[in-house]
Amino acid sequence: MALRCKTPAATCAARSRRSVRVSAHKGAFEQAQVAAAAFVAAAVIAAPANAGVVLQQPVLKKAFQDDTPAAPPPKREFRGLAPPALPQSDAPNVAAEKPKKAEVVESTSGGLDPRSVALPGALALTIGGFVAASKIDGSFNDWFMEAVVRDSNNYAGYEATLKSENGVTFPKVAAGGTKKVKAATGSKKGGFPFGGKK
């Protein structure tokens, strides 16, 4: 301390005893949050949204393959009995190589995409057709309700126990039971007491 301070020792001691005051204002954290949110909103709004369509496909590289074609395997000749060779034609094969067509990518610049109108248009057409049919024919609403809403009093057609006059009827339990059932239930009658006392 003596090396740094060339003034009297009392002044150096006073400087080293300085205290730092830290005060927090109410709402400082909220102000920082609002400032950060405003900065992010300004950055997002100001950034251009270039969601363009890529019209050319990138050329893919073959990482694990050589660019040179593989050498053809050597021909093995059989010098014994060989079938006769067919005559070779000297004319080049015209249909062998066809020129490749360039890929055409169509994009709609501007305008309205039909897919964004299809579902709302179909819903509007259906509801509009229903309203028009009900205005033209007064009995259309009755016919529609009869066709769509099923009367639940008829059930599905196969619930014989539900259609009976007494409502649901349970089958009767046989009076006697096997010895194992009687022993398992602990009753002399046997069976399980489903519908109350027996």
From Swiss-Prot:
This is Cytochrome b6-f complex subunit petO, chloroplastic. The keyword Transport applies. It comes from Chlamydomonas reinhardtii. Signal peptide: none annotated. Residues 1-51 form a transit peptide. It comes from the Eukaryota. Its main location: plastid. Residues 52-115 are lumenal. Residues 65-111 are annotated as: Disordered. CDD domains: petO. One of its GO terms (biological process) is photosynthetic electron transport chain. The cytochrome b6-f complex functions in the linear cross-membrane transport of electrons between photosystem II and I, as well as in cyclic electron flow around photosystem I. The lineage of its organism: Eukaryota, Viridiplantae, Chlorophyta, core chlorophytes, Chlorophyceae. Phosphorylated. The chain crosses the membrane at residues 116-136. Keywords: Chloroplast, Electron transport, Membrane, Phosphoprotein, Plastid, Respiratory chain, Thylakoid, Transit peptide, Transmembrane, Transmembrane helix, Transport. It is found in: Plastid, Chloroplast thylakoid membrane.
